[in-house]
Design a protein with these regions (language model features):
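Active-site helix of classical SDR
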Residues: 187, 222-225
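Residue(s) in the substrate-gating loop at a strand-loop-helix junction
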Residues: 206
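Canonical Rossmann dinucleotide-binding motif of NAD(H)/NADP(H)-dependent dehydrogenases/reductases
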Residues: 57-99
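Rossmann-fold cofactor-recognition segment
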Residues: 115-129
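Conserved NAD(P)H cofactor-binding loop of Rossmann-fold oxidoreductase domains
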Residues: 155-160
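C-terminal beta-strand-loop-alpha-helix "lid" module of Rossmann-like NAD(P)-dependent dehydrogenases
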Residues: 240-299
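Substrate-binding pocket helix/loop in short-chain dehydrogenase/reductase
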Residues: 163-164, 168-173
Length: 381
């Protein structure tokens, strides 16, 4: 009984939040209509009332949402931890049948999702054989359980911090293969099922697409490319009843493991760096490694705590008339991105650097770089 009350209260709160704008407008309009009536504008009041009713109806119509049922399947790519893991749990709580792909089939994320009733399959989006097996498994599951494919969520991503010249060819290639080509490949392989079920495609984008930042040039490029691809795909698939949406979930690096291997990435950069570059960057590289390694510790596997992420995500998943982009951003991000957009480059570049707050550059060759692994912080502490 308490669980039922909790669910009902939660739904009521969500309903009030979603329609709070129209409630406020209608209340203001009602007060205005009473004022007009008292002032003697009796013929104007019916016309204004009809306009208010029509506007309220259209607003509620636009804001209306579909319902989720157990025979609705949602595919989420990249669910080992972080956002993918959290969205898989949330979609399961909504009542959907969730199909989650993981890189590590025996990892803690896969095991916990399996305990929650999520269908977990192994998938490396850069491996064509894996893709084929995953698609066959999804097709079999949909047919066996008579499921309707409701949505594909492209979430798999790799982010490597480090200036562009430092990153190895393998690191750059990995980000391109997972973030951009991986999403394109899995979507293409699932497209026949997506068309048949008039499904929805949600692409996880990033604020780095809106404003690329130093240190993640390749990552920003993959997210910008992914968004451009999704925009064109949205226009192509609209006539088939397939909706394509970009979802920007916001920043939660400290709650995610997306940077857990950053120390090893820095070591690879140092090992492959030419001698000239080592002397040029010197202590700047070491300071950079220490700074960003401090925020790249592996975190405990937990569901993301920001409730706003799930509120915005539900709009992308359930709105009958969805927007092209859904963003979860704090007032700080909103102000920064507005300033980035309206200020000249000389000022916006300064704001971006202040926003990132990386270690300062003190000139070339300030100190010869320590070529040993001791130059990097010990991640075991």
């Amino acid at each position: 009984m308490e669980l039922v009350k909790s669910v009902m209260n939660s739904r009521l709160v969500k309903y009030m939040k979603r329609y709070c704008t129209i409630f406020t407008v209608d209340l203001s309009a009602a007060i205005g209509l009473v004022h007009l009536w008292n002032k003697g504008y009796k013929y104007l009041v019916p016309t204004a009332t009809l306009c208010c009713i029509g506007g309220s109806y259209l607003y509620c119509r636009i804001k209306s949402r579909d319902k989720i049922s157990p025979n609705h399947a949602i595919i989420i790519i990249g669910c080992d931890s972080g956002l993918g893991y959290s969205l898989a749990l949330h979609c399961r709580q909504l009542g959907a049948t969730v199909i989650a792909s993981v890189l590590q089939k025996d990892g803690p994320g896969a095991k916990k999702l399996g305990q929650k009733g999520v269908h977990v399959f192994s998938l490396d989006v850069t491996n064509f054989l894996d893709l084929s097996h995953f698609v066959d498994s999804v097709r079999s599951l949909l047919n066996e359980e008579n499921l309707e494919l409701r949505c594909l969520i492209n979430n798999a991503a790799v982010m490597i911090f480090g200036e562009f010249e430092w990153q190895t060819h393998e690191q750059i290639e990995r980000q391109l293969q997972v973030n951009l080509f991986g999403a394109i490949r899995i979507t293409r392989e699932l497209m026949p099922m997506i068309r048949i079920h008039s499904s929805r495609i949600i692409v996880i984008s990033s604020h780095c697409k809106i404003q690329p930042i130093p240190g993640v040039a390749t990552y920003s490029g993959t997210k910008a490319g992914l968004t451009a691809w999704a925009t064109a795909l949205r226009l192509e698939l609209k006539k088939y009843g397939v909706k394509v949406i970009c979802f920007i979930p916001g920043s939660f690096i400290k709650e995610s493991n997306i940077m857990a291997g950053q120390a090893e990435h820095f070591k690879m950069m140092m090992d492959s760096m030419p001698e000239e570059a080592k002397h040029f960057y010197a202590d700047y590289f070491n300071n950079y490694c220490k700074y960003f390694s401090s925020v790249s510790q592996a975190t405990k596997l937990e569901k993301l705590q920001d409730p706003r992420i799930y509120e915005v995500f539900e709009g992308a998943l359930l709105d009958k008339y969805p927007s092209a982009i859904y963003k979860n951003e704090s007032w700080r991000y909103f102000i920064y991105h507005t300033l980035f957009a309206i200020t000249p480059y000389c000022l916006s570049d300064m704001l971006v650097l202040k926003f990132v707050q990386g270690p300062p550059w003190k000139g070339p060759g300030a100190m010869v770089m320590n070529e040993s692994a001791e130059a990097l912080p010990d991640q075991s502490k």
